[in-house]
């Protein structure tokens, strides 16, 4: 990538993305995040919020279970998203998965996300990006679609380039040797 291409790419990122981090050394709560996101919606017209990773947020446990806290947090975020017309994405990692008999890990789904079935129950769309380290292919598994006009459950495979960190379609391979068999 040339210097000009890099500068153009960085300009595009700065025009289309806002990175909100806790620079004061504290851990953000969901209320902190939604307050700052509300300001970004009104000042800059933000339409998408990605919380990555969710497990870096502070949750005031008190006497509630983690399951109840997550359920309440997801309800709060869902209500905020509807009020502000914003799509919200959570990057959430699964609880510990165990290898299957073939040596591979299962594809995590919504119920595998740590601490609560609410991740599955309250999501409008849920999907998993699952990398196969043997083939360097990535499987996108859509495990939930609440509203059918948004899509359907299924799986698609992509090629992953470790060097560039990019995904691409897997090219069709034409076997010209089929006549010689």
Where are these regions (language model features)?
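Structural recognition of the conserved hydrophobic beta-strand(s) that form the central parallel beta-sheet
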Residues: 50-51, 86-93
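Active-site-proximal loop/turn and secondary-structure-junction residues that shape catalytic pockets
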Residues: 55, 94-95
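Conserved inter-motif catalytic segment of the P-loop NTP-binding fold
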Residues: 1-63
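C-terminal regions of RecA-like/P-loop NTPase motor modules
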Residues: 8-12, 30-46, 79-84, 96-181
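Short acidic, glycine/proline-rich loop/turn micro-motifs
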Residues: 59-64, 100-104
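Hydrophobic/aromatic beta-strand patches that form the interior of the parallel beta-sheet core
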Residues: 18-20, 89, 125-127
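Hydrophobic alpha-helical membrane-association signature
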Residues: 33, 69-73
């Amino acid at each position: 990538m040339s210097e000009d291409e890099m500068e153009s790419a960085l300009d595009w990122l700065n025009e289309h993305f806002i990175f909100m981090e806790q620079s004061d050394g504290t851990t953000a709560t969901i209320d902190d995040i939604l307050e700052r996101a509300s300001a970004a919606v009104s000042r800059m017209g933000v339409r998408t919020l990605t919380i990555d990773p969710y497990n870096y947020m502070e949750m005031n446990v008190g006497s509630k279970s983690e399951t109840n806290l997550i359920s309440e947090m997801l309800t709060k975020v869902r209500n905020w998203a509807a009020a502000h017309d914003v799509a919200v994405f959570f990057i959430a990692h699964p609880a510990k998965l165990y290898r299957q008999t073939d040596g591979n890990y299962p594809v995590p789904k919504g119920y595998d996300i740590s601490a609560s079935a609410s991740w599955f129950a309250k999501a409008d769309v849920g999907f998993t990006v699952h990398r196969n380290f043997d083939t360097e292919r990535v499987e996108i598994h859509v495990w939930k679609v609440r509203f059918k006009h948004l899509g359907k459950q299924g799986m698609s495979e992509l090629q992953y380039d470790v060097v560039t960190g990019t995904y691409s379609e897997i090219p069709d391979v034409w076997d010209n040797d089929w006549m010689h068999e």
